[in-house]
């Protein structure tokens, strides 16, 4: 998934909504596995910007600094092995996720729109 799955995404609606789908699907599967007392464990990774070729291909720029793919992968594996379900690497991304939860959606949408518009 992505941190984008936790908030509305004006000007990148398809991307944000696809990440929200992955997040909700993972939450549903986790509950099904728990109810069946399965030994199968899953996690959902919600990084912010990751330093990959995605930026060039999608033609986007990120306001936050990106983490290396190596850092994100190591962080994800370490936290998965600790039994964490929702894995969010980086302090600033954790803050953004928290703020998006306590802020009304219409305000989050306005902020996201402004951030996306600035990237053009």
Predicted segments — roles?
Residues 18:
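Active-site helix of classical SDR
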Residues 47-57, 62:
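Short, flexible catalytic-loop segment of classical short-chain dehydrogenase/reductase
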Residues 9-13:
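Active-site loop immediately N-terminal to the catalytic Tyr-X3-Lys motif
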């Amino acid at each position: 998934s992505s941190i984008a799955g936790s908030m509305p995404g004006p000007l990148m609606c398809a991307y944000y909504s696809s990440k929200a789908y992955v997040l909700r699907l993972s939450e549903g599967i986790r509950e099904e596995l728990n109810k069946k007392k399965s030994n199968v464990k899953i996690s959902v990774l919600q990084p912010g910007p990751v330093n990959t070729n995605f930026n060039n291909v999608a033609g986007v720029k990120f306001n936050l600094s990106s983490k290396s793919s190596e850092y994100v992968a190591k962080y994800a594996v370490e936290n998965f092995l600790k039994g964490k379900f929702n894995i969010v690497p980086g302090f600033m991304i954790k803050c953004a996720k928290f703020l998006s939860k306590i802020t009304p959606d219409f305000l989050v949408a306005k902020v996201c729109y402004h951030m996306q518009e600035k990237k053009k």
